[in-house]
Swiss-Prot record:
One of its GO terms (cellular component) is perinuclear endoplasmic reticulum. It holds the Pfam family ICE2. It comes from Schizosaccharomyces pombe (strain 972 / ATCC 24843) (Fission yeast). The keyword Iron does not apply. This is Uncharacterized protein C23C11.01. Keywords: Membrane, Transmembrane, Transmembrane helix.
Length: 441
């Protein structure tokens, strides 16, 4: 009887594993398999718990993003209504607050930091009200004026650093995306080539649209010279890279898009629109019947919602209009590429294609200091947009704090580094020097 049961067990093992070597299996091996069975059954629970924690972490990040968008709007209100001094005082107070919470986290006082995070929305609104009401009176105070002036000078002198970091981060992201496209085609399926060509055509179309929009602005002679030089350089480098096999269409189109973006931002931030050059008839974006239906739907929703909530929505929409679209676009692009670099560099060090999303209790320096960096970057962009000519008597300080000059310097250095990398890379290489640590095998 035992022999029959044992033979049946062997038959089951053979049918499951499909290996004749298991015919010589003894009872000790079967006991080991039985002992490991509960561990295998417990893995789905662990996976569910891990996915649940990741979902909660992503939800928390979305809440943090929404809260920071509110801060962006409030800082724009401070600069628009209260003026330069009011905006500087508010951003300096926010910088001190976020830096204090970062120090609390670094020194292990996370409970106090979490308590401050819980009251962040209330504290931000209180700081805005205090800055709007008290800025006219404290502007005459020499200590407050000195702090605001020092904060303004520090932000303006960070302009070269922010622009150069943006250029280097953009180059690394472009090369990582180009390498990822090659990896998908070589290791997954050649059908990915269709999506790569589609993305490249979209990038080129967006670049041409941005350059077309530039024609509505008056362009100075130095800017016209830099536009022609940068566009000619990126076209020559892209043709050389694609023809030699050292770059692909994805990289070439993204580099062209980066130069077109730089040209557009320089002209929109520092150029005067020439409205007489383009006179276009105004058309409705949607047919009249659809517009009427949408208007009726919005009227119904506004009548249903409480009046207070409706007023809050109107206030937020009106406040969001105080933020210039070019400032918001530049801020979103700069933060996106810098954040992408924080995900790409660990992936390069670990020789993997991408870094899995995770948020542990022991946060890194980037996640702790990110609010301080975001406030500094955004305030720097606002100062560049609202006050493009820094009030410095020294020519050296004017050059150091000129965003227009450093945008061009960043673009030219990025193209130069990309050209050097293409020139010294081998034709058989499927990755670039900056991304050569990725594995294709």
């Amino acid at each position: 009887m035992d022999q029959e049961i044992r033979s049946n067990n062997y038959d089951i093992s053979v049918s499951t594993v499909e290996d004749t070597s298991f015919e010589a299996m003894d009872d000790s091996i079967l006991e080991i398999i039985d002992d490991e069975a509960p561990e295998i059954q417990g893995k789905p629970k662990a996976n569910i718990s891990t996915h649940f924690r990741n979902m909660l972490a992503m939800f928390g990040n979305f809440l943090s993003l929404g809260f920071f968008l509110v801060i962006i709007v409030l800082v724009g209100i401070a600069f628009e209504i209260g003026g330069r001094f009011c905006g500087l005082i508010l951003t300096l107070a926010l910088e001190v607050y976020f830096f204090s919470t970062a120090l609390l986290k670094l020194f292990g006082l996370r409970k106090i930091a979490l308590t401050l995070h819980f009251f962040e929305p209330l504290l931000v609104f209180i700081l805005l009200i205090i800055a709007l009401n008290a800025s006219p009176s404290i502007e005459q105070n020499k200590y407050a004026s000195f702090l605001a002036s020092a904060w303004n000078t520090a932000l303006l002198h960070f302009t070269p650093l922010f622009n150069l970091l943006e250029g280097m981060a953009s180059l690394l992201v472009v090369q990582a995306l180009g390498h990822l496209s090659r990896w998908l085609v070589h290791n997954k399926s050649e059908n990915w080539m269709f999506f790569i060509l589609l993305n490249a055509s979209s990038a080129i179309s967006m670049s041409l649209y941005l350059l077309y929009r530039v024609s509505s602005f008056s362009i100075s002679n130095p800017n016209a010279l830099m536009i022609g030089f940068s566009l000619a350089t990126v076209i020559v480098i892209s043709i050389y890279g694609v023809a030699s096999g050292r770059a692909n269409l994805s990289e070439a189109s993204l580099m062209f898009l980066y130069i077109a973006y730089t040209v557009y931002m320089v002209c929109t931030d520092f150029g005067n629109p020439n409205t007489s050059s383009l006179e276009k008839p105004k058309f409705d974006y949607l047919p009249p019947n659809i517009l009427q239906s949408v208007h009726y739907l919005i009227s119904t929703i506004s009548a249903t919602l409480p009046r207070t909530l409706y007023n809050i929505v109107l206030f937020m929409v009106a406040a969001a209009k105080t933020v210039a679209p070019s400032v918001f676009a530049t801020f979103a692009f700069r933060i996106s590429v810098m954040y992408a670099v924080t995900r790409i560099l660990p992936a390069i060090q670990n020789n993997i294609i991408f870094l899995e999303y995770s948020r542990t209790s022991k946060q890194g320096m980037w996640s702790i200091l990110s609010p301080c960096i975001l406030i500094a970057v955004y305030t720097n962009l606002l100062l560049q947009h609202l006050y493009p000519t820094p009030s410095f008597t020294s020519p050296v300080n004017q050059i150091l704090c000129s965003a227009e000059i450093w945008r061009w310097v960043s673009a030219i250095l990025t193209l130069l580094l990309y050209a050097i990398e293409l020139a010294y890379s081998k034709e058989s290489d499927t990755g670039q020097a900056l991304a050569s640590h990725f594995k294709l095998d």
